[in-house]
């Protein structure tokens, strides 16, 4: 997952820089059995949203770790956050919290739905922590390679 996270950060750096947002990768190797392209899509879509819904001068951090039988990747941002009443719906197809913002930032409303299905395909789970005005942190955990 660390190499996937680094590739995503490299690919999204121009977009992040263009919006005045820093993007960083940290952690240790976290290996999983999986389809590399789908793992890339998971991290890419999470980071793309973290950039889109961030603030000028904000940051996105991608962290990887392997512990307790799981390999995890966490994408954290300093963005606008997600209100509690929307948090259980953001992985639905075409659901958008802020339709006015999504029109200006582009996208189809499918990115997080793709994440959900790709994580399920790999027998993983998703956890979200967010509060309006305080950013969002999404952790995806997969069974680790023993």
Write out the residue ranges for each language-model feature.
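Acidic ATP/Mg2+-coordinating residue in the GHKL
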Residues: 77
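Conserved glycine-rich
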Residues: 123-124
């Amino acid at each position: 997952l660390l190499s996937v996270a680094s590739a995503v950060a490299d690919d999204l750096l121009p977009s992040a820089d263009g919006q005045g947002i820093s993007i960083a990768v940290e952690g240790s190797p976290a290996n999983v059995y999986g389809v590399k392209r789908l793992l890339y899509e998971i991290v890419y879509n999470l980071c793309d949203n973290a950039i889109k819904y961030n603030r000028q001068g904000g940051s996105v951090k991608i962290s990887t770790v392997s512990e307790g039988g799981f390999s995890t990747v966490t994408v954290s941002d300093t963005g606008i956050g997600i209100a509690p009443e929307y948090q259980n719906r953001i992985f639905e197809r075409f659901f958008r919290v802020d339709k006015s913002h999504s029109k200006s930032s582009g996208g189809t409303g499918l990115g997080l739905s793709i994440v959900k299905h790709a994580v399920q395909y790999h027998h993983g789970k998703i956890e979200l922590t967010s509060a309006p005005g305080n950013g969002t942190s999404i952790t995806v955990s997969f069974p680790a390679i023993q």
